[in-house]
């Protein structure tokens, strides 16, 4: 079975990258509109006029398709960033980056419990980060 772990930071970075790619493609398409849809017949005969119409029709289809792709790309970026926001709101305080975790001293917190033989022992804790993946903090236990 495959698992996918995504953190809000990774989703935000992916959305930013995808948005940048979409912007670059949109600029290139806008620059190409005039050159691709305004093909003129090279001569006065019917064959060259038909070829020019064919190129213009293909260019118009391409630009219509690229507009649909741009709309999908915009929706995809919104979905990524919106999903990240929902994830952050639902996780609340538990959703912190690893750096914030370390800065807060979460790795140094220890809980003790009384074992069956009356000795106090350190207990291993699970801390869940933004990705939903347990981060195990291992503490040494001396067993007799």
From Swiss-Prot:
InterPro entries: PE-PGRS_N. Transmembrane segments: none annotated. GO terms for cellular component: cell surface; extracellular region; plasma membrane. Residues 98-124 are annotated as: Disordered. Residues 1-87 form the PE domain. Keywords: Cell wall, Secreted, Virulence. It comes from the Bacteria. Forms a complex with PE10. The complex interacts with human TLR4. Together with PE10, induces macrophage apoptosis through human Toll-like receptor 4 (TLR4) signaling pathway. Interaction with TLR4 leads to increased levels of phospho-IRF-3, increase in the transcript levels of IFN-beta and pro-apoptotic genes, up-regulation of IL-10, down-regulation of IL-1b and enhanced levels of macrophage apoptosis. Belongs to the mycobacterial PE family. This is PE family protein PE9. The gene is PE9.
